[in-house]
Amino acid sequence: DHNGWSDFKGEKRSNDTHQSQTDPEALLYRKGKGREAKLYHSGHALMENRNGLLVALTAGPANGHAERNATCAMIRHVRKRHWFVPATLGEDAGFRGKQHASELAELGVVQHIAGHKGRKPKGWTASQRCRKRIEQIFGWVKEVAGLARTRFIQRWKTKLYLLAAGATYNLLRMKNLGLAA
């Protein structure tokens, strides 16, 4: 047609062939097998298990390796900034991989993967019970803080809003735990 619109039915779409006109940093990403690819930025969080407080939060590109890379980067950041390194890290099955496990081992962190059939390290069951809290954080950030559909163009703006939402979540969590004075 004359205005350049077309449907892409039957055409292969990838980040090489398609780019957002409004936000070039947003990438096509498929959240699961058989699901459609949409433009996303990805948010990553690191939570301590004892109280369910966020320790680190960041936004990055939406691709298959962003979560693994962000995890190690956040652990390094927390170690450098707060002199704190988590002893264990509860992760879902998407984090399974020898390279990621060896990177975590170099950082001194034991990986606890959900649904892992092999030998379970000490504290695995408790770590998996705490994993529900991280999902609650993401649910809160999407529904209450409004990041299910971000209205910000450029990743740094999305990251700033994500950090503000994370700080707000921590304040509410501390209030509910009775830690805030």
Regions found by a protein language model. Give the residues of each.
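Short hydrophobic/aromatic-enriched beta-strand-loop microsegments
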Residues: 107-115
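Short small-residue beta-strand/loop micro-motif enriched in glycine and branched aliphatics
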Residues: 53-57, 122, 148-150
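Polybasic low-complexity intrinsically disordered regions
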Residues: 1-105, 166-169, 174-175
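Short acidic loop-to-helix transition motifs that present clustered carboxylates
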Residues: 96, 118-119
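C-terminal structured domain segments across diverse proteins
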Residues: 92, 106-107, 131, 137
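Short, small-residue-rich loop/turn micro-motifs
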Residues: 49-51, 115, 145
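Basic, amphipathic alpha-helical segments enriched in Lys/Arg and hydrophobic/aromatic residues
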Residues: 126-181
